[in-house]
Structures are given as structure tokens and as C-alpha cells.
Amino acid sequence: MGGYDLRNLKKNTHTLTEGSVWKGILLFALPLLGSSLIQQLYSTVDLIFVGQLFGTKASAAIGASGLIVTCLIGFFNGMAVGTNVFAARHYGAKRFNELKRLIQTIFWTGIIGGLLLMVIGFVFSPTFLTWMGTPKSIFPLAVRYLRIYMASMISIVSYNLLSGVLRALGDSRTPLLYQFFGGIINIFADFIFLAVFHMGVEGTALATLFSQTVAAIGIMIHLYRLKEPYALRFSIKECSLREFMDILKVGIPAGVQSIIITLSNIIIQSQINTLGVTAVASFTVYFRVELIVYLPIIALGQAVVSFVGQNYGAGNWNRIKKGNKFSILGGSVITFAACMLLIIVMPVILKAFTKDTAVAAQTLEIVKVTFPFYFFYTVLECFSSNLRGFGKAFLPMVVTVVSFCGFRIAALFVLMAQNPSPDKVALSYPISWGIAAIAMAVLYVRNRSGEKAL
């Protein structure tokens, strides 16, 4: 155990290897959900300020960078899964010397990786936006916004990776607190830079840079003040190539999966665009209200990764089995019940998003097509997270990419071949969820780490 005082370990972190399984997973997932909601708040507040104060062109300039930003953040959220898995495993197994080296490795991975992205982004922002077909009327604004935004990459990458460490140690509340604090600063900075100094899209990017930097520094200070062995000491000499390769083994497949799925959504959006303005507006609203279901499922999956990682390290096979059953069966039942309730109250919810009755009616029809089958996504996410918790990320990536990019797009074109409609676009989603859930279940049974884990 490396001679470390376990009382300090208990004092500073939370363990998922003891106590009630279902309560531990749910209480751990709630702060993760809060963090996701605050991240959504960042972009929403930016668009509100820019749209109200600087008009359509400024909003479009930010939107033009949206896919690039989504891909980058999605990739490093995937990398954070890698940090989560191995930090949780070391923590659960009480391999404290390895945990210490891993944390230093994660820190310098974030700093160096973020710096490389910042330089690449600054130099190649015009090239990226050209590839995206950005309209000439907003091109200069989009370049200025993206270049300043890319300056925040060190902070964004470091925050995501170090938050993965804290989640692995069983602490999902601290990242939430710093995310919340960063969100408040983002709103305040938006007001100062946009309403007071009238800085336009540059002000929005600076607000993001400022708030993300504060959140990242907060996480670093928090880790620095912890007791050994999981304190951050900024020591590059303690970095480990082996730990770095372990992070990449899980993190890169998860990150690549996020990017490919994001890119596949361009094809789906192109089909939606052929259905007219009302359909485009309806799906825009749908993708907003869908977050009510989607974000809790993602939070549950993140909690499962930490839960499995810690218990795998500790050798608690029976506890993993119980957590697996609760997350999949309990999560599916809760998802189905929540979706049925949401369908009933959806007409009221939609009034907050649109005043157009045609858009509201079409959005409701889309919800009725997808929500009854959303439990498939819970099954998919939980099986996938279980496998990642075991350190197996490549095959889940293959299943998800083939299902979401292959079967979904194939189903979309088959359904749209005759009498295309928004309902048929919507139907391609549950088809791909069902295929992916079944394939992931088979994959889990065939690739589980021993009979005890099932």
C-alpha cells in the first residue's frame, strides 16, 4: 500500500466499494448530471447574450464553430473516461504509488495536449472553417471567435481530465462545484464583455476562456491540497509512459467514437433540412427537450464507469454484478417511466421553447416516436460503461459507431426513400438504439472479465 495513511484516504475521498449499491450509484450520478446541465448553460447563455446584443451574424459565427468545438470537447471527454477507469482501478486496488504517478501523468497530458490544440487551432482555424463551408459574410467573425476560443483548450482539457480523476476517487461533487462557479463567472463575464464593453463574438470567447480557466485552476488547487497519494504535485519527473499508454488505450476509442457520431449527425441533419423550415425548427426544439432524458442517462453511465473501475480494482465481483443489474434493469425502468410521463406533459414543456403551434405539434410527434424506446439507450450506455470500467473500450466503440453511423444512416435512407417525413427521420434513432443495445449486451457477455463479473 506504499505506507500511506488510509484514514486520510477515507477523509478526502468517497468509496464506491462499500455501502448500498443503488444508493451509491445514484448519489454519485446526481452531481455528474448537474455538471452536464451547467455545461449546457455555458453555450445557451453565450447565444442569448450574442443574439440579443449583436444579432444574427454574430450568433451564426458562433454556430459555425459549433461542430469543431463539439468534436474537440467530445474527444477529451472520451479521454477523461481513460483517466477515470485507471485511477478508479488503482484506487480500488489500493495501488497508491501507481495512482500517484497516474495523477501527475494526467496533469501533464492535459497541459501539453491542450497547448498543442491551442497552437493548432490558432494556426488552422481559417482552414477548419473553410472545410465547414462557412459563409463568407460571417467568416472573419467566426475565425476571430474560434481562435480566441482555442486559447481555452489548456483549461478545458485539464479540467476534463482532472475531473475524471476526482470522479474515479468517488468525488463527483467537487467538479460540480467548480463547474457551477465557472458558470456564474461565465454569465458575469458575458455581461461585462458584451453588454458593457460591446466586444462582440470576441467577448463571448474571452468569457469562455476566463471561466474555464478559473474552473481548471480550482480543480488543480483542490487536488494539490489533498493528502498523498492522490495529491497533484506538478512533477513531470513522476510521469509514467505506461500510465499514459493505459489512458490512451481507453480514452482514444471513447473520444474517436464521440467525433464519428458527431460527424454522422451532419448526414442526418442534411436529410432534415430537405423537409422544410418547420421540420428543421421541430428537430431543433426536439434536440433541446431530449436533453431531459439524455443527460441523466449519460450521468448514469459515467457513474457506472467509476463504480466498476473501483470495484474491479478491489476484486468485488459480486458488487459489480449487483451494480450491473441495478444500472441496466433499474435504469431502464426509470427511463421508460420518465419518458411516458414526459410524453403526457410535453405539450406544456414545448410552450417554453416555441410559440409556433405547427412546430410544437410536429415536435410532439417526434417525441412520441422516440421516447417510448429511449430505454434501449440506457441499456446501451450501461453495458458500454461496464465494459469501459473493465478497461475494454475498443469493441464498444466499434458497436456504437457501426450502429449509430451505419445502421442509423442506412435506416434513414430506406425510410426516406418513399414519402419522406420528420417521423421517419425520428424512427431511425430507436432502430439504431435497439440494434446497439442488443449488440452491446452480446459483447458484454462474450468479453466480460470472468464469470464472476456477470
Where are these regions (language model features)?
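Short alpha-helical transmembrane segments in multi-pass integral membrane proteins
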Residues: 1-29, 87-152, 196-252, 308-373, ...
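Hydrophobic transmembrane alpha-helices of multi-pass small-molecule transporters
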Residues: 71-74, 186-190, 216-220, 292-295, ...
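Helix-terminus/linker motif at the lipid-water interface of multi-pass membrane proteins
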Residues: 41-60, 129-136, 192-199, 259-292, ...
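Transmembrane helical elements of multi-pass membrane transporters/channels
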Residues: 27-46, 148, 159, 182, ...
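Residue-level signal for short hydrophobic patches within transmembrane helices
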Residues: 18, 22-41, 45, 68-75, ...
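Small-residue-rich hydrophobic transmembrane alpha-helices
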Residues: 59-119, 156-175, 282-346, 377-400
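Small-residue hotspots at the loop-to-helix junctions and early N-terminal turns
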Residues: 56-67, 146, 205, 277-292, ...
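Short runs within selected transmembrane alpha-helices of multi-pass transporters and secretion channels
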Residues: 80, 148-167, 175-183, 204-219, ...
